[in-house]
Amino acid sequence: MLFSEIIGQEHLKKHLTHSVDNGRVPHAQLFVGREGTGALPMAIAYAQYVLCHNTGGENTSGNDASKLFLEDWRKLINEQPYCNLFDWYKQLGIDNKQGQIGVDEAHDIVKSLTLKSYEGGYKVMLIWMAEKMNIACANKLLKLIEEPPSKTVFVLIAEDEEQIISTIKSRCQILHFPPLAESDIKI
């Protein structure tokens, strides 16, 4: 996903690209925005920008290593970049269950981030719907978010900032995504 494919939020796009261009990439960020504000697409574009070669404020040359996503996730994002949690549950076939990010997932995150990056560059961990982390998961990730390995970036994406535990929030740079302007939405 490219920044040019994201509707509106120009000030946030500029902030994110300037931080990378100036070598000031925060190790932990929390993108907070209601459904439809573009927080998830922005996080994906930002991750690509951090991981890939950039020209003119975009990831134009790509990086095959950054395309190692789960097949179902990639399919959903390609078809519906502004998807919501219900769409993801539907894609997984768990329409009637309540999603939660548990300690097992936290263990997998810790394990994957202890590995060196493929080409010695950044490692970016996106955690979508971060408010779904249970307390055990949040506590397991806390130390890693506080003191991540070199060139490791966490981007947590949430709709409800108040449901994120305060110790996690205090370690993140928080970016709020306002509702899209009517002029951005018009065809």
Where are these regions (language model features)?
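Switch/connector loops and helix/strand junctions flanking conserved nucleotide-binding motifs
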Residues: 39-41, 135, 163-167, 183-184
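Short glycine-/polar-rich loops that comprise or flank the Walker A/P-loop
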Residues: 25-27, 120-122, 148-152, 162, ...
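Sensor-1/coupling segment of RecA-like P-loop NTPase cores
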Residues: 127, 133, 148-165
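Conserved catalytic/switch belt of AAA+ P-loop NTPases
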Residues: 114, 139-156
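Conserved AAA+ ATPase core "coupling" helix
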Residues: 165-187
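Small/polar loops that bind or transfer phosphate-bearing groups
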Residues: 8, 129, 156-157, 176-177
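Clamp-loader machinery-focused feature within the broader ASCE/P-loop NTPase space
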Residues: 2-136
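Short regulatory helix/loop adjacent to the ATP-binding pocket of P-loop NTPases
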Residues: 136, 140-145, 160-171
